[in-house]
Regions:
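Alpha-crystallin/small heat shock protein
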Residues: 1-106
Length: 106
């Protein structure tokens, strides 16, 4: 699951990543696309243990997110806390200049 938010200064991407280790995530930016890929390892099987129900997803994931504006590639911050990966991307000066309020006429 993924949310993308926006302020005047930055874009904020939040991705649910429960059980995923920081070292198992790779984040890249290219062609105005943010790519987040990684893997969630399955728990070690215990001898004699079987599941009544198993709904957790394991394995590799690869998300590509087209960004709605240009960002400054040198001002990106990522943090993994409580199973949520948060990536903050500062908008480029050009993107901020293009943003303007449009008046509505009657």
């Amino acid at each position: 699951n993924l949310d993308i938010g926006e302020t005047n200064e930055e874009l904020v991407v939040e991705l649910d990543a429960p059980g995923v280790k920081r070292e198992d995530i790779e984040i890249t930016l290219g062609d105005n696309t943010l790519r987040i890929k990684g893997k969630r390892e399955s728990q070690k099987e215990e001898r004699g243990k079987s599941f009544y129900r198993s709904e957790r997803e394991y394995g590799e994931f690869d998300r590509r997110i087209g960004l709605p504006c240009e960002v400054d590639a040198n001002r990106i911050d990522a943090a993994l806390k409580d199973g949520v990966l948060t990536v903050k991307l500062a908008k480029s000066a050009k993107a901020k200049e293009q943003e303007r309020k449009i008046e509505i006429h009657t």
